[in-house]
Amino acid sequence: MAKYDKADLERRMHGAVESLKHDLAGLRTGRANAALLDPVTVEVYGSQMPLNQIASISVPEPRMLSVQVWDKANVGPVDKAIRSAGLGLNPIVDGQMLRLPIPEMTQERRKELSKLAGQYAEKARVAVRNVRRDGMDNLKQDENKKEISEDERKRHETEVQKLTDATIAEIDAAATAKEKEILG
């Protein structure tokens, strides 16, 4: 049974790109985006819960987030969780609604976030290269077991390399676009 599976490699590489896009969406760019609050967890009902499971998040204005807490008892913990999340956001409590004005970013903060976007991209590139290495190793094992010929192995290795190059180009494009967005 051949170990090489091109569809599996494509799926895993695509997963690395999707993970990067999710990470980049969470970086604050000066514009309101509900994904900013994805990493926020709130201590309620005796456990940590993601904010989006105890409140609805909307973007009423370009520089304002709105968090509608469903249970009035959770307003305090939600306020505390957002303030302590390290996002630089200070909620204004209005009943069960929290308004989060998005402050202007300093040039220093923009550079930090740009650097972080680069780190996320590098993490995704490493993941893609690891998938590539797994694919190449599987091809060599298949050839050693005489399941594929040397010519087939070389042809598949070329396919894997093309897939890797295309995926890394996609990662670079996403990271570059995000860095431009952050730096203004």
Swiss-Prot record:
Similarity comment: Belongs to the RRF family.
> What residue spans carry the Basic and acidic residues bias annotation?
133-162
Q: Which domain of life is it from?
A: Bacteria
Which Pfam families did the record assign?
RRF
Which keywords appear in this protein's UniProt record, sorted alphabetically? Cytoplasm, Protein biosynthesis
Localization, UniProt = Cytoplasm
Q: What is its main location?
A: cytoplasm
Q: Which GO terms describe its molecular function?
A: ribosomal large subunit binding
Give the protein name, as stated in the record: Ribosome-recycling factor
InterPro entries linked to this entry: Ribosome_recyc_fac, Ribosome_recyc_fac_dom, RRF_sf
Q: Where is this region: Disordered?
A: 133-163
Q: Which GO terms describe its biological process?
A: cytoplasmic translational termination
| Cellular component terms per the entry's GO annotation | cytosol
Protein purpose: Responsible for the release of ribosomes from messenger RNA at the termination of protein biosynthesis. May increase the efficiency of translation by recycling ribosomes from one round of translation to another.
